[in-house]
Swiss-Prot record:
Record note on quaternary structure: Interacts with MhpF.
Protein species of origin: Klebsiella pneumoniae (strain 342)
Encoding gene (name): mhpE
Protein family per UniProt: Belongs to the 4-hydroxy-2-oxovalerate aldolase family.
Site keyed Transition state stabilizer: positions: 14
Annotated GO MF terms: 2-isopropylmalate synthase activity; 4-hydroxy-2-oxovalerate aldolase activity; manganese ion binding
HAMAP family assigned to the protein according to its UniProt record, in alphabetical order: HOA
Protein name (Swiss-Prot/TrEMBL): 4-hydroxy-2-oxovalerate aldolase
Binding site for Mn(2+): 15, 197, 199
Cited function: Catalyzes the retro-aldol cleavage of 4-hydroxy-2-oxopentanoate to pyruvate and acetaldehyde. Is involved in the meta-cleavage pathway for the degradation of aromatic compounds.
Pathway assigned to this chain's UniProt record: Aromatic compound metabolism; 3-phenylpropanoate degradation
Enzyme class: lyase
Length: 338
């Protein structure tokens, strides 16, 4: 660590959207953003769970527009930067500009780990706007560390100044994380920062984040009470407690985060964010964490087991954006069971 301060990136108000089907009220966004700001996090990501313009039949409709959520969060903070997420093909340059005007100053441009080339235009435009521009390689477990590094290089060449390893399926262990950070560090410019976005489906969210920092990672994504897709993200308050024990500088108030997690965030969960039969299946099968609620709904509709649906999705190597295939898989399983 050599005494450097970690950049703490909170994702409660973006990844956490998945946990409550994108239904945060504006008052809740203000309350949570205000608490995170006071606790000293560096950035607070705000958007529909699937990024700008994610509100749709495919992903689920949000209670409010991204812009309304971003404006609400921006009003509530005085120190932290407001971040947002953009998936090229869902969000457009127009949406990014609107988010910037609403107060977002950091953007994470997210692609499937093997499709960095679709982000060129969006990354370049974000840099033109003067945003802190991050490349976000989702489902990083699905390709080799060396292949991931080549995709990271592409994002760097388009203008991203930080590249994230994103364990969207919560499917990786500490060795997987080390291998990927070593591969990235071997090819990226020394001034290009790196980040880690973990999911807790195998209960390794915090351990994987620690392994990333040990490999030189600069930014850590985490959320209050782990609020996020699947079994959630690395729980922010737990990661900070562990970082404290390791003597790492993080600049946040642990007790303020603990209070925000239990007083503000946990009560909002209509389905507990935890490792259980279904979320463990996500991590074990390497499935996109936000498929959880969609798969549970399909299982209920067709009288199937959500685990069976998730395992089949894993076998078919489905990735984010293929939510419409969940019903297809359910119908195939129904026919198979006849």
């Amino acid at each position: 660590m050599n005494g450097k301060k970690l950049y703490i990136s909170d994702v409660t108000l973006r990844d956490g959207m998945h946990a409550i089907r994108h239904q945060y009220s504006l008052a809740q966004v203000q309350q949570i953003a205000g608490a995170l700001d006071k606790a000293g996090v560096d950035s607070i990501e705000v958007a529909h769970g699937d990024g700008l313009q994610g509100s749709s039949f495919n992903y689920g409709f949000g209670a409010h527009s991204d812009i309304a959520w971003i404006e609400a969060a921006a009003e509530a903070v005085s120190q932290a930067k407001i971040a947002t997420l953009l998936l090229p093909g869902i969000g457009t340059l127009h949406d990014l500009k609107a988010a910037y005007q609403a107060g977002a100053r950091v953007v994470r441009v997210a692609t499937h780990c093997s499709e960095a080339d679709v982000a060129a235009q969006h990354i370049a435009f974000a840099r033109e706007l003067g945003m802190d521009t991050v490349g976000f390689l989702m489902m990083s477990h699905m390709i080799s560390p060396q292949a991931l590094a080549q995709q990271a290089l592409k994002m760097e060449s388009y203008g991203a100044t930080c590249i994230y390893v994103v364990d969207s399926g919560g499917a990786m262990n500490m060795n997987d994380i080390r291998d990927r950070f070593r591969a990235l560090k071997a090819v990226l410019k020394p001034e290009t920062a790196t980040g880690m976005h973990a999911h807790h489906n195998l209960s390794l969210g915090v351990a994987n984040s620690i392994a990333a920092v040990e490999e030189g990672c600069d930014r850590i994504d985490a959320s209050l009470a782990g609020m996020g897709a699947g079994a959630g993200n690395a729980p922010l308050e737990v990661f900070i407690a562990a970082a404290d024990k390791l003597g790492w500088q993080h600049g946040t108030d642990l007790y303020a985060l603990m209070n925000a997690a239990d007083d503000l965030v946990r009560p909002l969960q209509d389905r507990p964010v935890r490792v259980d039969r279904e979320t463990l299946a996500l991590g074990y099968a390497g499935v996109y964490s936000s498929f959880l609620r969609h798969s549970e709904a399909a299982a209920e509709r067709y009288g199937l087991s959500a685990v069976d649906i998730l395992v089949e999705l894993g076998k078919r190597r489905m990735v984010g954006g293929q939510e419409d295939m969940i019903v297809d898989v359910a119908l195939d399983l129904l026919n198979r069971n006849k």
